[in-house]
Amino acid sequence: MTDYGEEQRNELEALESIYPDSFTVLSESPPSFTITVTSEAGENDETVQTTLKFTYSEKYPDETPLYEIFSQENLEDNDVSDILKLLALQAEENLGMVMIFTLVTAVQEKLNEIVDQIKTRREEEKKQKEKEAEEAEKKLFHGTPVTIENFLSWKAKFDAELLEIKKKRMKEEEQAGKNKLSGKQLFETDHNLDTSDIQFLEDAGNNVEVDESLFQEMDDLELEDGEDDPDYNPVAPGSDSSD
């Protein structure tokens, strides 16, 4: 007759020595415990993790143990579902033998596989973004292929813009023509400027101030005086002189 209690106690002792940092006893009757399983580090030291809870049934290992995912980190819902299916399959295959180590090892491998899938998915997303950016750059460089439809659309827009430019230019030329002075207007403008200058001088009268410093060196200038020149001839050469 199988002593299920002894087999369970022996396995618990083995599990505690194998997983000293992740094994936790929850209760002794019925025997219940958790084991935390962590994947190997992936890209950027990212990991996925789950804590498995096991409870021995009365006739374990001839009956499968009760199991559940007690907690998890960085796992999607479909990952959790896959792990539970894996546990069910492994439990059936190992029925009649102590199996907790086998179940935990299978989950460990599954977590490593999930990390690899995450890495692959991110690499594919990165490549897809690079491809989209490259295609956008090519489209920008080569431009949009010309079709009858987009050419007619462009032509209509171009003609409308050209018409607006012509209207603006005509308006500016018309305005410039209105502001252009005739010959008579230019003459009257010049005459008015002369009159205003004369009026300014008359209004200033004796109030006009002269800066004498401008003339302070005039005495030092050697002005040529014809009478002081012994060779001076008041009659210009070539002119007719009469007594």
From Swiss-Prot:
Record-annotated RWD domain positions: 10-114
Pfam family of the protein (one): DFRP_C
List of residues that carry N-acetylthreonine: T2
CDD domains, per database record: RWD_RWDD1
Keywords associated with the record: Acetylation, Phosphoprotein
Listed PANTHER family: RWD DOMAIN-CONTAINING PROTEIN
Superkingdom of origin: Eukaryota
Protein task: Protects DRG2 from proteolytic degradation.
Alphabetized InterPro entries for the sequence: GIR2-like, RWD_dom, UBQ-conjugating_enzyme/RWD, ZC3H15/TMA46_C
Presence of the UniProt keyword Phosphoprotein in the record: yes
PROSITE patterns per UniProt: RWD
Stretches for region Disordered: 208-243
Oligomeric form and interacting partners: Interacts with androgen receptor. Interacts with DRG2.
The UniProt record lists the keyword Acetylation: yes
List of residues that carry Phosphothreonine: T144
Name of the protein in its database record: RWD domain-containing protein 1
Region (Interaction with DRG2): 142-197
GO process annotations (BP): androgen receptor signaling pathway; cellular response to oxidative stress; cellular response to testosterone stimulus; positive regulation of androgen receptor activity
Family that this chain belongs to: Belongs to the RWDD1/GIR2 family.
Residue ranges, compositional bias (Acidic residues): 209-231
A single GO cellular-component term on record: cytoplasm
